[in-house]
Amino acid sequence: MQRRRCRYAIGIDEAGRGPVIGPMVVVGVAVCSNDIDKLVALGVRDSKQLTPVVRAKLYGEILRVALHSVIVKLPPALLDAVNLNQLEVETFEYIASRIAGVHDSPEAVYVDAVGSPEKLAARLSGRLGVRVIAEPGADKTYPIVSAASIVAKVVRDAEIRMLRRLYGVRGSGYPTDPETIAWLAEEYRRNPANPPWFVRRTWSTLKRIAPGWYVEKQATTQPPRGQRSLLDYLLGEKQS
C-alpha cells in the first residue's frame, strides 16, 4: 500500500493518569491539516463531555480520518517504578518520533500539558526539532488533541471492562470512586499478601485501605547508559 503524504499535525493526550487501578493510556493521533475540519464535523471535542456510547462511535471515525495513530499502554508496575512526569514526557516523545519515522516531520505537535507547559514545550521541541504547543486543557481547545483524548479514553475504558470481567473489579479505578475503594478494601481483607498486578502500589490511597500492598516509590528518572530514553529502556529497545 502506498504511503499517504500530506502536511500534518500530531495531537497527544492520555487517559488514566490518576487511577489506582489499571494502565495509563497515552495516544498520539496524526491528521492531515486539510482533514482537521472533518474532526470538527464529526463532533470531536473533550472526551469528558461525551458519553461512553458517543466516544465509542467517534473512536472508529477518528481512526478512519487519521493519517497515523500510536497507542501506548503503561502498566501499573511501570507507573510505580518511574517518575510519572518524566515517563509522560518520554512517552510523548516516543509517540511523536514513531509517527515522524513513518511520515515526514509534522508541522506541529499539540499536547495536553501537565505541570509547566513552557518547559514541556521547550523540551519536546528541542528533542523532536518541530514546533510544540503544550497547554493545560488542550483537549478542550484543539480538535486533534480531543481526538487523541477520545481514543485514549475508549482504550482505557476497555481495559477496565476486561479487569471487571476477569477479576471482578468494581468501579472506575479512580481513588475518588467509593465503589473502587470498597472493592480494594474487600480484596485486601481476602488476600493481604498478594496485591493484584493491576493495582498501582505506590498510590497513597493504599496506605489507608491496603497498607500491606503499599510500597514507597523509588522512581527511576534517568535511562541507563547506551539507551536513547527512559521509555526505550523500559520497552527493551536498545540504541542501534
From Swiss-Prot:
Gene3D superfamilies: Ribonuclease H-like superfamily/Ribonuclease H, Ribonuclease hii. Domain 2
Residues reported to bind a divalent metal cation: D13, E14, D112
Molecular function terms, GO-annotated: manganese ion binding; RNA binding; RNA-DNA hybrid ribonuclease activity
Subcellular location: Cytoplasm
Top-level division of the source organism's lineage: Archaea
Family, similarity comment: Belongs to the RNase HII family.
Name of the protein in its database record: Ribonuclease HII
Taxonomy of the source species: Archaea, Thermoproteota, Thermoprotei, Desulfurococcales, Pyrodictiaceae
Gene designation per UniProt: rnhB
